[in-house]
Amino acid sequence: MEGFRVLEIKKSVFENNDREAELLRKELKRDKTFLLNLMSSPGSGKTTTLKATIAALKDEFRIGVMEADIDSDVDAATIEKTGAKVIQLHTGGMCHLDAGMTKQGLEGLGVDDVDFAILENVGNLVCPAEFDTGSSKNAMILSVPEGDDKPLKYPLMFSICDVLLINKIDVMPYFDFDLEACRKYVRRLNPNIKIIPISARTGEGIAEWADWLRTEVKAWNEQ
């Protein structure tokens, strides 16, 4: 008979995080603060999309941004130029944020004067999808150069998101990217997901994205 214990750490970590996430979500709802968790792989255009999003909505919402990275403050410096409130979060080598880290970030950001908070999660299609941050909605970006088969390779990320932005559609003619095939792969995983093709560089699709956000913020505040 073995004289040692086996502790299922992963299950315990997820269960604890889920509890923290629900508590945070209730606090955000009470305070009427909408939190968007934005995820993608590195280089998909998250920061450029954020800049376009802030430009479209800054006159309607008090926007605060949390930039999560393993290191550096390049993205926070970029977002600061938009006039939005911003804080840089260093994860100390971790490839995701969990609910506890997100709460720390919100406290550091200061949300008394923020009604729309955006978390730009660490660039990664695996780890961020596994941890509930306590967000109101989950969004992800897939860029055209990454390929239309990413939903087949990273199904969890596409399964847990409420909206998918397919970015860099302005360069689609130069890549072997089948938009309809991509839609089909995503819908198999998540029939209810909203899919919005955009180009953060040219502005195409940003109006539809901004409209979706307006609707979701309003619904959140009316719950």
Enumerate the predicted regions with their spans.
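Residues at alpha-helix caps and immediate loop-helix transition turns in enzyme cores, especially N-
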Residues: 49, 98, 150-153, 178, ...
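Residue-level signature of transmembrane alpha-helix interfaces in integral membrane proteins
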Residues: 53, 83-85, 99, 136, ...
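Residues at the C-termini of beta-strands that transition into short coil/loop
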Residues: 90, 142, 199
